């Protein structure tokens, strides 16, 4: 069962994300909302999350990962939908993400390819955008975008996770 990541989870979370070749920048920042699941032995087995942009209207989906032995179970779709739902609950109207390898997966969820310039313009203060700009990686990324449903109670359910 997914639970919100706590400060005590951050080391394990970062190690898991590194093993999935995902960005670990700014995991503890207030705008970054992360959830994880642990197996019976206490090891992280799935993660998901998003970073809410400073305007509150754009969210950068990030840290969607499934341990290799659990792939093919539908967990990836479940995790992605969870992040999208939580971002919409927080008031986001647009979802964005970087993915060089999983475009087909994200297209199943309604994402379409966009430019990294468009993503960076929508989320200029996102930690991942700033990191990719500073390292020159932004131009090598592939960006994706989709609108989110407008929720009448946006922001009310984020803390409930």
Question: Predicted regions span which residues?
Answer:
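Conserved acetyl-CoA-binding loop-helix of GNAT-fold acetyltransferases
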Residues: 66, 72-85, 89, 97
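Accessory recognition modules or surfaces
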Residues: 73-79, 124-138, 143-145
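Conserved active-site alpha-helix within GNAT-family acetyltransferase domains
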Residues: 89, 93, 100-127, 133
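Conserved beta-strand in the GNAT
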Residues: 36, 42-53, 57-65
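Short amphipathic alpha-helix that is part of the acyltransferase structural core
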Residues: 1-26, 34, 38, 43, ...
């Amino acid at each position: 069962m997914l639970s919100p990541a706590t400060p005590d989870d951050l080391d394990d979370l970062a190690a898991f994300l590194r093993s999935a070749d995902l960005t670990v920048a700014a995991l503890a920042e207030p705008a970054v909302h992360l959830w994880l699941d642990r197996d019976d032995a206490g090891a992280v087995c799935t993660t998901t999350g998003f970073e809410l942009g400073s305007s509150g209207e754009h969210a950068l989906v990030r840290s969607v990962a499934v341990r290799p032995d659990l792939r093919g179970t539908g967990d990836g779709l479940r995790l992605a939908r969870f992040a999208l739902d939580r971002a919409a609950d927080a008031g986001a109207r647009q979802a964005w993400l970087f993915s060089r390898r999983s475009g087909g997966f994200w297209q199943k969820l309604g994402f379409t390819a966009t430019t990294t310039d468009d993503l960076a313009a929508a989320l200029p203060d996102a930690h991942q955008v700033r990191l990719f700009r500073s390292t020159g990686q932004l131009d090598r990324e592939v960006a994706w975008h989709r609108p989110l449903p407008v929720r009448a109670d946006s922001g009310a359910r984020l803390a409930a996770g």
